Regions:
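Beta-strand cores of modular interaction/reader domains in eukaryotic scaffold and signaling proteins
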Residues: 72-74, 241, 263, 294, ...
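Helix N-cap motif at beta-to-alpha junctions
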Residues: 77-81, 345-346, 465
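Short glycine-centered segments of the SAM/dcSAM-binding site in methyltransferase folds
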Residues: 238, 261, 382-384
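Mobile active-site "lid"/loop adjacent to the S-adenosyl-L-methionine
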Residues: 257, 298, 309-374, 382, ...
């Protein structure tokens, strides 16, 4: 009887349900398993950029994951210039223009006399490509379209393969455009940019106000000055910064004291407010610039200088009222919204890799191409458009440039020339690593442990007809 009872007890025990209580959302084990938006961004970059950049991706990745990146200081021309320069130099900072001129002179004075021009040109190309000597051959834009993520992305209406969207831009990959060499990078007289040498991670002191009541210098990522320099600003230029927030590049342009007209535009009120804040903090005697500086809130895809800017600015620019009936912009900076590759690895806030922004991220190249296309359509003959992103994505970089050039060629009779700036940038290779990962149109400064700034892609396009 006892044996029977024991068997029954065992059967009843076997039927008992064991209830397991999960840990709360804030428990360390749950948090550890939870994938953040930053994790998703890194996973995407590993899958995508690993294929595009080959073995070089590992070192780029290491630099990107370091939270503190390297800045340069743009001296405020509206403050006490000589004092500021002296103070920055006392901290060990060097003037970027001086560095460029020293290395440019060294290159000019030490050509190889014993070798043919062909050999020297080959060596120059090898130096530019030295960064990727260990990378996979022929990776880059041509191999980009083979990238297919392992997972599908749920859109609002249907399932979308990320590669299907990117594949749309394959159409412009083989589009040919005239190419012209640029041999010199021009530094405007009043644009003073200071940096620390390679492997020096010193931080600039906090900027203080000078005798004119504005801050002494503006800190920005060291690679962000390159698109501004590529504009090749000249006295009297009319300049448009299409996507200007937070305002660092607009401010850098103003520091040259060259623009006769400066228009800083962005699409949202909050972003426009950031531009205005920077201008108020750094531009003294704003009244003197009231008739030359304008901050606008417009969608860059639909800016029409013959219409919108004539209406917005003719009340300020009486002298130019008639000129605004035709195209007037001689320089346009197109620093488009992008995946902001460094930022998304260090901030959860409003991260473009969060699920709610999937469709926005997939549509980025389409948006970028539309903005660049519009810029190319409104630039004046002889004018320069500089397109830039802080992304490593060949789709957002060369891919977008190719699509925009193709569209302009199809829809207008304009003639565009893409500037090959390899020679002009060569003296800056002491500070920047310019990777040539199959790029056809532009240039890219990639992050390194020695100088951890960037990434920054930029492409200079000039309209000749």
């Amino acid at each position: 009887m006892a044996r029977l009872f024991n068997r029954q007890a065992i059967k009843d025990l076997a039927k008992m349900q064991v209830v397991r209580y999960g840990n709360k959302a804030d428990h360390w084990s749950v948090i550890k398993k939870k994938k953040t938006h930053m994790d998703k961004a890194l996973k995407h970059f590993d899958e995508f950029y690993g294929d595009v950049y080959g073995k070089s991706w590992e070192s780029i990745r290491t630099a990107l994951l370091i939270k503190e990146h390297k800045y340069m200081a743009v001296v405020n021309s509206f403050s006490d210039i000589d004092r500021i320069k002296s103070e920055l130099e006392s901290h060990g900072a060097m003037n970027l223009k001086a560095i460029y001129e020293i290395y440019k002179k060294h290159i000019d004075e030490n050509p190889s006399k014993s070798k043919s021009n062909k050999t020297k040109n080959k060596q120059a190309k090898n130096r530019i490509k030295s960064l990727i000597s260990d990378a996979e051959p022929n990776v880059g834009l041509s191999g980009l379209y083979e990238f297919v993520p392992a997972t599908k992305i749920k859109g609002m209406e249907d399932w979308i393969l990320e590669s299907q969207h990117y594949g749309y831009y394959k159409e412009g990959a083989n589009f040919s455009v005239n190419n012209e060499k640029e041999v010199l990078l021009t530094f405007p007289q009043y644009l003073n940019i200071y940096t620390f040498e390679e492997n020096n991670d010193s931080r600039f002191p906090s900027s203080k106000k000078g005798s004119t009541g504005v801050l002494d210098y503006y800190l920005l990522d060291g690679a962000s000055v390159l698109p501004v320099l590529a504009l090749d600003l000249q006295p009297g230029d009319a300049v448009l910064d299409m996507c200007a927030a937070p305002g660092g590049k607009t401010l850098s342009i103003l520091q040259t004291l060259m623009p006769n007209i400066m228009v800083a535009n962005d699409i949202q009120k909050s972003r426009v407010n950031r531009i205005n804040k920077v201008i108020n903090q750094y531009v003294a005697g704003i009244g003197q610039w009231e008739d030359r500086l304008c901050v606008t809130e417009r969608d860059a895809r639909f800016i029409d200088d013959k219409d919108m800017y004539n209406k917005v600015m003719h009340r300020k620019f009486d002298f130019f009222r008639e000129i605004f009936i035709i195209t007037i912009f001689l320089q346009i900076l197109v620093d488009v919204p992008c995946t902001t590759d460094r930022h998304v690895l260090h901030s959860e806030e409003n991260n473009i890799f969060k699920p709610q922004r999937i469709r926005e991220r997939l549509k980025l190249p389409e948006l970028q191409a539309a903005i660049l296309t519009n810029a190319l359509k409104i630039i004046s003959v002889g004018g320069t458009v500089v397109y830039s992103t802080c992304s490593l994505s060949p789709i957002q970089n060369d891919g977008v440039v190719g699509m925009a050039l193709k569209k302009v060629w199809e829809e207008t009779n304009f003639i565009m020339i893409v500037k090959d700036m390899s020679e002009a940038l060569s003296p800056l290779k002491c500070l920047y690593k310019f990777g040539n990962f199959g790029l056809k149109y532009g240039h890219i400064a990639i992050p390194t442990l020695q100088n951890n700034w960037g990434p920054m892609y930029f492409c200079k396009i000039v309209r000749t007809r």
